[in-house]
Structure formats: C-alpha cells, structure tokens
Amino acid sequence: MKYSIASMKVTLFFYFLCAKNIASLKYTKSNLSFLYNGCDNINSGGVNAHRNKTTVQTKNKHSKLKILSLNEKQDEELHYELNPENTEKVLNLIRPKLQIDNGDVELVDIKGNDLYIRLLGNCITCSSNSVTVSQVIKKTLKMYIRGPGNKEPNVIIINFDEINEENILNCLSDLKPYFDFLKIKLVIKEMINNKENINNSVMLVFKNIENEDKEVNIPHNIKTEITGRLKQNFPTLTVNFEN
C-alpha cells in the first residue's frame, strides 16, 4: 500500500514538472516569434527607408543633370552674327586680362567667314604666352560668333597664322641666343605659301656669322626643335633644311 502511494506521488510530481516545462517552452517560443517578427519589421523598415533615400538621391541627381544640360544648351544658343561690332564685343571680354600684362588685341578684317585678328604689346614678345593667348582668343570667338550658314568663324591670328618670313623668324626668336652662342644665323632660303594652305613649305639654311662659306653642322635635336615650333604655329607648313 505504501509502495502504491509513493508511486502515485512520483507520477504526479513528474506530471506537474512536464506541464510546467511545456508552458515555459510555449512562452519562450512566443517570445522568440515576437522578437523575430519585430526584427523583421525593423529590417524591412530600414530597407524601405534606404530605398526611399536612394530614390530621393537619384531624383536629385537627375534634376541636377537636367539643370546642367539646360544651362549648357542655353550657352550654346547664345551666338552673335559675324560683324565688326559683335566681334569687338567679344574681344572686350578678353581685353582686360591682356591689358594687365600690357598686351592687347585688335580686329583687322573680316572676309566671308574668315576673321583676322592681331595681337599687340606683350602678347607677342613672349612666344609661349602668345600661343596660349591665341588659343583663348580663338576659342572665345568661336564660342560666341557665327558666320554665314551658322558656321564657326575661321579665326586667323595674323601675327602667327600667316606664313611669311617675319612670322617664321618671330616664332624662332627664343632660339636666337643659342644661335648667337654658336656664332651662326638662320636664313630662310626659300618659302612657298599658297592661299589654299596646301603644299606650304620653307627651306632653312644655317650660316656662320663670321664666314658664310664655312660649313655648319647643326645637331639633329636642334632641327627637331625648330620643326616642332614651326609646325605648332603653322600646321600646314613643311620644314626643310639645306644643311
């Protein structure tokens, strides 16, 4: 009898213990489910917020691009007719910076779509500076001026672009101290200049200052330097050397 009562007590004890553990597991599972769903909602909210932020940034980016494109288009459409008055207006945009260094620029002539410009003052005494100034002037005039048929003008800087003896020697003036040191001089023996700017050529010869009949040998790198400088100013010019 005692044995039966003891067995019943043990059975009841294990029954309540299992019931308690099952309830605890259910509660834990419920909590875990809540935590999982909560984290999922938070992550979803974060992803959605990130997507919304990205969308706004993309819209702003496209908006900026549209504004930039519109401004560029407006600048491209701002053109003046090719005539002396409008050319002077555009040159006035450049003059203040040139005049700071005692330089200037002037309109020489307009023939059809050809625009002839001359550099003045310090603009032509420094060869490296004159090349830069020429490029700026050409770019600015082509940006704002349009000739017949809405074409960009053919800007000709007569100090450099016209092929003649004076301009060729001016282009090489920086090398004169070197020639003086070697006691030689550079002479233009022959020059061909076509108005069509084709088959233009120049024949150069080096002569000894003290004795012109004396043979002169010039290093190849000096000839290369001379050719490079002339081709930079006169792209259509073929440079030849007699000696």
Swiss-Prot record:
Q: Which UniProt keywords apply?
A: 4Fe-4S, Apicoplast, Iron, Iron-sulfur, Metal-binding, Plastid
Q: In which pathway does it act?
A: Cofactor biosynthesis; iron-sulfur cluster biosynthesis
Q: What happens when the gene is disrupted?
A: Disruption affects formation of merosomes, merozoite-filled vesicles budding from mature liver stage parasites. No significant effect on life cycle progression. No significant effect on the numbers of liver stage parasites. No significant effect on infectivity in mosquito and number of mosquito midgut- and salivary gland-associated sporozoites. No significant effect on the initiation of a blood stage infection. Non-significant delay in blood stage expansion.
Q: Name one GO molecular function term.
A: 4 iron, 4 sulfur cluster binding
Record's keyword annotation contains Magnesium: no
User: Quick one: signal sequence residues?
Assistant: none
Organism domain of life: Eukaryota
Task: For this entry, list what GO says about its biological process.
Answer: iron-sulfur cluster assembly
Question: Can the keyword Iron-sulfur be found in this entry's annotation?
Answer: yes
Compartment annotation:
Plastid, Apicoplast
Q: Which GO terms describe its cellular component?
A: apicoplast; mitochondrion
A Pfam family cross-referenced in the UniProt record is NifU
- InterPro entries in alphabetical order: FSCA_dom_sf, NIF_FeS_clus_asmbl_NifU_C
Q: How does it assemble?
A: Homodimer.
* Described purpose of this protein according to its UniProt entry: Binds and transfers [4Fe-4S] iron-sulfur clusters to target proteins.
Question: Its family?
Answer: Belongs to the NifU family.
Name listed for the protein in its UniProt record = NifU-like scaffold protein
Q: Which gene encodes it?
A: NifU
